[in-house]
From Swiss-Prot:
GO terms for biological process: translation. PANTHER family: 50S/60S RIBOSOMAL PROTEIN L14/L23, LARGE RIBOSOMAL SUBUNIT PROTEIN UL14M. Belongs to the universal ribosomal protein uL14 family. CDD domains: Ribosomal_uL14. NCBIfam families: rplN_bact. Keywords: Ribonucleoprotein, Ribosomal protein, RNA-binding, rRNA-binding. This is Large ribosomal subunit protein uL14. Part of the 50S ribosomal subunit. Forms a cluster with proteins L3 and L19. In the 70S ribosome, L14 and L19 interact and together make contacts with the 16S rRNA in bridges B5 and B8. It comes from Mycoplasmoides gallisepticum (strain R(low / passage 15 / clone 2)). SUPFAM superfamilies: Ribosomal protein L14.
Length: 124
């Protein structure tokens, strides 16, 4: 469960290492985000040569959560960290980076993030 002030690892090569959640989108009083949800984030830690800098406010999609998710077939999928991928805008869901590190959840394909799924090395 991702909420306001949660720190997330960044699973792409944009240059950001860690971001903090500012807002969970899609709902006026929505509190929690899970895999496949879009959040507004602020870059907390970044490498100097990256395309994003510390303090920038961006959109990101959640790709891994420690909380996990219950699937319809009864399986439960949880990851070792909370991670996101930075996207260009809310309309086309295109990732800003060209590589995605680590596994991502299969639920992203169902929610329309096909470009993120195609860049990922492993889909669980």
């Amino acid at each position: 469960m991702i909420q306001f002030m949660t720190r997330l690892n960044v699973a792409d090569n944009t240059g950001a290492r860690e971001v903090g959640v500012i807002k969970v989108l899609n709902g006026s009083k929505r509190r929690y985000a899970s895999v496949g949800d879009i959040v507004v984030v602020s870059v907390k830690d970044a490498i100097p040569s990256g395309t994003v800098k510390k303090g920038q406010v961006l959109f990101a999609v959640i790709v891994r959560t420690k909380k996990g998710a219950q699937r319809r077939d009864g399986t439960h999928l949880a990851f070792d960290d909370n991670a996101c991928v930075i996207i260009k805008n809310r309309e086309d869901f295109a990732p800003r980076g060209t590589r995605i590190f680590g596994p991502v959840a299969r639920e992203l394909r169902d929610k329309g993030f096909n470009r993120i799924v195609s860049l990922a090395s492993e889909v669980l």
